[in-house]
A protein has these predicted regions:
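Register position in tetratricopeptide repeats
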Residues: 102, 140, 147, 181-182, ...
Length: 304
């Protein structure tokens, strides 16, 4: 009986060792980074070389990345060979898409992200790391559609990105940009709110949040002209600023801040009559506006 159990134990041990060796190769092939799921040693070797070439290219070219440069040509070649050796090698498609991203080869990048998504979606269980990569793939496809001005496609991909990874700040950022550009201001504001909730210091997020909020309040066209007017005023380009502020009140006759700054420009240029007229408009809309009241008195003093 003991011999029988010993024999069974030895057989099971051999089976387990065999399975572990396959598991180890399938899921940890590569450079000890992400799990690589391939049974092809050739594919794994090619991808390892491709990654090394990519990293060398990044260091060598310092941002001047073009697909015809030697190291990038080699990185692309080895990544493609990895895919030829195993067409379902998920990590190889991901890395090749990255290489195309670095070299600004947008069409091929989009193609590889699409293939990567197809392969990932076939998996029954997706690791947190794979989810982040999937979200990034959706984000890059969304950005590619944005570049082509395919805003419907862009929104769909970006929404998929934040569905997979709600903390994907870049996807929320571009949703905010796209929604603003097509006039969906409330959706844009919601996206900027999410960006700030994830990262309060995300570059320009506060600016866009304020811009969209004011666009909702005053009207997109009116606020766009108002903002342009203020920037021109800061540069002391008064004629151009006057034109922009006048456009702002044309789109929104109740835009008190535009009237206020028109008054300031006319006052600084010595046109006290026009200055007073614009500050009266401010007070008509906002009777308690103390700044307009003060400046109106100053203009009227100059007219006496």
């Amino acid at each position: 009986m003991k011999k029988r159990y010993l024999k069974m134990f030895l057989i099971l041990s051999l089976i387990i060792c065999g399975l572990l060796s396959v598991f180890s190769f399938s899921f940890t092939a590569g450079q000890g980074e992400a799990a690589w799921e391939t049974l092809s040693q050739e594919a794994s070797d090619y991808l390892e070389i491709a990654i090394n070439k990519m990293e060398e290219a990044i260091k060598t070219y310092q941002g001047a990345n073009y697909p015809n440069k030697e190291l990038w040509v080699e990185a692309i070649d080895y990544a493609e060979k990895a895919i030829e050796a195993d067409p379902d090698f998920i990590e190889a498609h991901y890395r090749l898409a990255q290489i195309y991203q670095y070299t600004n080869w947008y069409y091929r990048e989009a193609r590889e992200w699409g293939r990567y998504i197809e392969l990932i979606q076939k998996k029954e269980v997706i690791s947190p790391e794979a989810e982040q990569k999937l979200a990034f793939a959706y984000y890059r496809l969304g950005y590619a559609d944005y570049q082509r001005e395919d805003y419907d496609g862009c929104i769909l991909y970006l929404q998929n990105a934040v569905k997979v990874d709600p903390e994907n700040t870049e996807a929320h950022y571009w949703l905010g940009r796209v929604f603003y550009e097509i006039g969906r201001l409330n959706d844009s504001l919601s996206s900027w709110r999410k960006v700030l909730a994830i990262d309060p210091h995300y570059p320009r997020a506060k600016y866009f949040y304020t811009k969209v909020g004011n666009s909702i309040k005053y009207g997109k066209e009116a606020y766009s002209h108002y903002e342009a007017g203020y920037n021109l005023y800061e540069q002391r380009l008064f004629e151009e600023a006057i034109y922009q502020y006048r456009q702002a009140v044309r789109y929104n006759p109740n835009f008190s801040s535009a009237y206020y700054w028109l008054g300031r420009i006319y006052y600084e240029r010595g046109n006290y009559q026009e200055a007073a007229s614009n500050w009266k408009e401010v007070l008509r809309l906002e009777p308690e506006n103390t700044k307009a009241e003060y400046w109106l008195k100053q203009a009227e003093k100059q007219l006496k």
